[in-house]
Amino acid sequence: MTNLAPAPVELGPWRPRLAAWSGLGLVIEALEHTGGLPTPTNYVDDVLLREPQREPFLALIDHAGLVVCKQVGADHPTHREVRGRSSRGRLSQGEYYHHDGCSGPVKPRVVEIRCPHQATPRHIATAIAPFPATVHAMLHELPLALVTAELAPWHALALAGGEVPLADCDLVQGLLNRTIRRDLDAESARAYFRAVDLRAGAYREPWSFGESRFIANRNPVRTMQHRRAYLEIRPNGHPNGQQNGHLLKRWPAEEA
């Protein structure tokens, strides 16, 4: 992937130092103050999520879809553990592309996922991709043998270069997920979703300690979906063959 110089971004007196990156979203390596003030260790909570930078930062996430903040020196009490694990036989719900908060009356505006400083590295990836590109990619990558009568018109539409109407995308994705869950074993399903990641242009970079990923979750123009992604086949198909660092999560527009 070719590295490109990103356009400058300013949040009040603070200027994010952006990584050279041409993939999905923006990657912030550090913050710099135009007046030369030192940057707080936890620049996410002490600068970006505080007024007057808070709303411009949330708007930046809405616009970019994904903003990655590197080298954040501390966590915050509002973070909570990301729970859920997968098994040898079936995928857990977290391995399917999803928005957060779908079961509630209103989805959160932004989802933050944090890899805290810890003794054990995080080996399992998190894939983040635009919606409804995830739905179109799932249709394209669906094996022909799994195209049911319900999915056939949507599959044909996708292969012909058409787009599923946004109002129908949740329905179609639900049909796809049920088909995958019913007809593919766990490792075949993981291989399928790896292909979906690539087609949808997912962000799947390795986690680093002190990294936060801010994901637009409710923006009608630039919303994202995410999933837990096993990028390597584990011995005997088992995903838990090595120690794996944990992740934290919160909904910063509502909780921070």
Predicted segments, located by residue:
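Short, solvent-exposed coil/turn segments at beta-strand boundaries
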Residues: 62-64, 169
